[in-house]
């Protein structure tokens, strides 16, 4: 007979704890939603500013040109100075894969939610196919430059012995070293990805301004792209500080910028191209007035 009140009190306490935890979860979800909304709005406003995008180009140029000077003021034994560090292996070496995955999801959601048309969505996604072709083509061109400008050397205790082997493949097969002009493919790829992601993400400001559907999944994907863009900037700075020769880095960044200009700055504005980011997604002002 005495157990009844005890059991009832235990059940009441458990119910109060569950209610308290449920309320706490709802508060945390509300805070997370508010932060997601606020963060995506502010990031979209920053990336959508034409003035800030021009300053961003100047920032990338300053990083590549003046960043190597920081090597005299940083610890050469830091983890980022090692070719085998986690970020270099997992992110830099697969930079295009990360960029294509994150940015592909963002472009897919933005274009399809704005137009509901598969053909238009596929056209905008084809910019990533062009980007992959640019990446592969540039990599092959860099190897060709290294082959044409290089010579074969055998490392000896006294120094290097020059060999007459005609090409890189036969030189490496013989266990020797091939030394030529090596354009920094990492600097090229990170520069190209930074410019490409900034250009694509800038569309989100106009997307929000037109009142198009922007739920939590889309905002989260957008912020993930912003975080990846920030990571690419940081890893580009680490690359120019710790790795490669100065001219190799500058040439790599220059080629990446030129590739961006040929595509986003020129070709994508033509009617026979994949189209520039945001092209055909939003109604023009005069068409809105005519409809009204």
Curated annotation (Swiss-Prot):
Its biological purpose: Plays an important role in the formation of lipid droplets (LDs) which are storage organelles at the center of lipid and energy homeostasis. Directly binds to diacylglycerol (DAGs) and triacylglycerol.
Lineage: Eukaryota, Metazoa, Chordata, Craniata, Vertebrata
GO CC list: endoplasmic reticulum membrane
Example GO BP: fat cell differentiation
Name by which UniProt lists this protein: Fat storage-inducing transmembrane protein 1
Compartment(s): Endoplasmic reticulum membrane
Principal location listed in the UniProt entry: endoplasmic reticulum
Gene: FITM1
Lumenal side, ranges: 1-18, 76-94, 163-187, 242-249
Segments crossing the lipid bilayer: 19-39, 55-75, 95-115, 142-162, 188-208, 221-241, 250-270
A GO term, aspect molecular function: triglyceride binding
Active site: 186, 244
Alphabetical keyword list: Endoplasmic reticulum, Lipid metabolism, Membrane, Transmembrane, Transmembrane helix
Signal peptide: none
Cytoplasmic compartment residues: 40-54, 116-141, 209-220, 271-292
Family named by the database record: Belongs to the FIT family. FIT1 subfamily.
Keyword Transmembrane found: yes
Site label Important for catalytic activity, positions: 248
Membrane topology according to the record: Multi-pass membrane protein
